[in-house]
Amino acid sequence: MNDLFKAPTNASGPVECLGQMYPSDQARREHFLKLLAIKLKDPDFRKIEGFPMGTDEDILALSDPPYYTACPNPFIADFIKHYGKPYDSSVPYNKEPFFADVSEGKYDPLYKLHPYHTKVPHRAIMRYILQYTAPGDLVQDAFAGSGATGIAAQLCGNREVVQSLGYKVDPDGIVYREESEDGKTSWLPFSRLGARKSILSDLSPIASFIAYTYNTPSDSHEFQREAQEILSEAERVGGWMFQTLHNPTTEQISSAVSEIKSDDTPDLSETCLTGRVNYTVWSDVFSCPECAGDVVFWDSAVDKEGGKVNDHFPCPSCGASLTKRSMERKWHKFMDPYLGQVVEQAVQVPVMINYKVGKKRFQKTPDGADIELIKKTESIRTGDWCPTFALPSGFNTRQPIESHGLTHVHHFYTGRNRIALAAFNARCKHPLLKSLITTVAFRITKRYGLTYQAGVWGAGGGPTNGTLYIPSLVKELNMFEMLDNAISKCESKAEIQSSDAIISTQSTQGIEIPPNSIDYAFIDPPFGANIMYSELNFLWEGWIGALTDRKSEAIESKAQSKSLNDYRKLMTDGLKKVFEALKPGRWVTIEFSNTQASVWNAIQTALQEAGFVVANVAALDKQKGSFNRLLKYPTPMRGTLL
């Protein structure tokens, strides 16, 4: 890591890590990378349950040890030894269940910095950590997802953030909350201001990577400066792909087409006034069952002025009354420049372009130059690496394969967005910079649907959450613009000031934490068949070069031949690990969000088999209708866990 990325307190000079001093943060990283490289050569190390699928090179490129490894983290024991406090039965610990219902929105800038399927607002988790822990305590999240528990643990040391939760903090760092009894209110002490340390792990490489980006301090201004330099370099490679002619004549279009055909990086500004593409609308093309004529969905089915898609519409060729279900998509075969083989996909054509000239926006129907430029970008391959992993079999992955023939990761991107993303990715030399790739790589794809809002086609829009669904009307955003937007949002990380978390990539069942070493755990585990994480994460993980090992994924899935009972067994094994790691008498909070009684019964059984006892149920409103379950580790008697 360049020292300029670190927070101002560590910007240059010696740094301390796990009790040892290093000349610089870069020296620290290089030292631990060498140790990790040696560890990766150990066959037994790679046998740890949940070890991701990836090369040593890719794992090392992503990792920032000891704080984060894109594989099982071999430095967790060192972290606990350095920061943890041994269990002492003579030290009193008596915390009552946290009875208050919690409501926290999901609109905090830090919460929105990087997308992920399910996220608990870190401000909500802070309330639980403050209730059950003291400054410096170790907090575990064994299903860490995007790492909100780590953020919450660290921000318990931020006076301003703690006070924003409605608490009071006195000059000595005592935290008070308001309580009412018999109509009288008073402020009672219940915690202390101070950061807690966290141990985060997740089976998914992209989840642990996002957790790393959230929990790693950086100088946001220097980070943005470096990222903007990379973006400028990438735009020099592919900026030409997002130009369009403004009010061209027929002659100018013809001249532009010739320029596009003859030049590898055509500059159309010499032909006509040009604009920069904001987004392009793509439409499915169907075949009429009566005359076999082409039916462009946008042209035939969409009521442009009314802002709706008609259920019934006429064939433009024969006039037959059609519905979307009565037609079949038109397919075509072409040479895939990345696979080097012929593939077959559903036809989608550009039907509208939104662009700007200066600061003014315009819309147009694609002209001959636009079609030729798009054709060029779809058929070329640059020297920059792009993920071409084949989609695994699954519930979510089946839809894009069957509907549009998208069989590999790179198929989810238009030619120019694929080239743009690859160009930026190739120039990111540190994993923190690659977080900008993952910020856009799942969302800015052919999953992004066109919508009609406030009287305008193209306003709003987005992908369907929890799916890989490809809509019939796709809004292709300018990837360079989206990367620029991602860079501008990095200011929200200013609250993260120190490396108080250690992050591992592995299954909960395989993690090795010394018994009786954790002070509190907050987890948000998968629930039955709610979300197929490994399938949805595949696009993201393709870009970082590390894929989830699905064997130990705790879900219910026909594609993986995992029944509800298999899910229960996997959850039991994972919860046993959490149980063993917790100090006696300590607490774990488990959030759940599944309305199926059978799934909840399976979870209850898993909890009981792991040794937990339910103490309280309370609502956790994150504007998604979910709940949490509070549990307590029983006090041991004669060394036996009851």
Language-model segments: which ranges?
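A short glycine-rich, Lys/Arg-flanked "PGG" loop and its adjoining helix->strand segment in the class I
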Residues: 568-584, 609
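Conserved beta-strand signature within the Rossmann-like core of class I S-adenosyl-L-methionine
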Residues: 586-592
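Conserved SAM/SAH-binding loop
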Residues: 146
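Intrinsically disordered, low-complexity linkers and terminal regions
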Residues: 1-67
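Hydrophobic beta-strand segment of the Class I
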Residues: 521-522
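Nucleic-acid modification enzymes, centered on SAM-dependent nucleic-acid methyltransferases
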Residues: 46-142, 150-514, 533-560, 574, ...
